């Protein structure tokens, strides 16, 4: 068994909640703004025994991991929670909160089990800081993508 690490990051997006929720809900597009995520594929609901199932591939620093994740709670325009089903043990949530007409807060919390093979090579505190920084950069790229798309919609 490995060590569990938790990371929390927050950003404020200068766009309405609807736009922010819509962009995040397109799980297959997450690799556009999550640099360590190589791909996310939605599993065909007709062939899967579990609802809301996705297959994730993470590739970073010479390591590659795959896992399936299931959305365990979906509150439209408010919250998504998930947990892994096999593969890399992970769980998390993202909470959206309107801060006025054009501002939306996005709070991402990710918890995962650090595999022993990585723990042997990396000190937990160093890895924890690196992952938190990467998640913050990812959520900031998400913010930039939503704001760019929203501004393009507003000017057309």
Regions found by a protein language model. Give the residues of each.
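Glycine-rich portal/gate segments that line the openings of hydrophobic small-molecule binding cavities
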Residues: 41-91, 105, 137-156
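Hydrophobic ligand-binding cavity/cleft-lining segments
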Residues: 1-49, 152, 156
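Short loop segments at secondary-structure junctions
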Residues: 14-18, 74-75, 99-101
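Hydrophobic beta-strand positions in extracellular immunoglobulin-like domains
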Residues: 13, 58, 110-112
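Hydrophobic/aromatic beta-strand elements that line small-molecule binding cavities or substrate pockets
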Residues: 9-11, 67-73, 91-98, 110
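Beta-strand/loop substructures that line and gate deep hydrophobic ligand-binding cavities in soluble
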Residues: 83-137, 153-156
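Amphipathic alpha-helical segments that line or abut small-molecule/effector binding pockets
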Residues: 18-21, 136, 140
């Amino acid at each position: 068994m490995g060590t569990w690490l938790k990371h929390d990051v927050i950003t404020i997006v200068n766009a309405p909640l609807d736009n922010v929720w819509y962009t995040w809900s397109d799980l297959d597009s997450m690799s556009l703004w999550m640099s360590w995520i190589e791909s996310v594929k939605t599993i065909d609901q007709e062939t899967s025994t579990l609802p809301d199932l996705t297959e994730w591939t993470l590739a970073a620093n010479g390591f590659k991991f795959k896992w399936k994740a299931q959305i365990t709670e979906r509150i439209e325009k408010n919250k998504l929670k998930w947990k892994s089903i096999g593969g890399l043990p992970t769980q998390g949530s993202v909470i959206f909160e309107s801060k006025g007409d054009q501002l939306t807060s996005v709070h991402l919390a990710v918890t995962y089990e650090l595999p022993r093979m990585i723990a042997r090579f990396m000190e937990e505190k160093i890895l924890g800081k690196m992952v938190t920084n990467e998640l913050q950069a990812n959520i900031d790229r998400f913010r930039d993508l939503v704001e760019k798309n929203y501004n393009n919609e507003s000017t057309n």
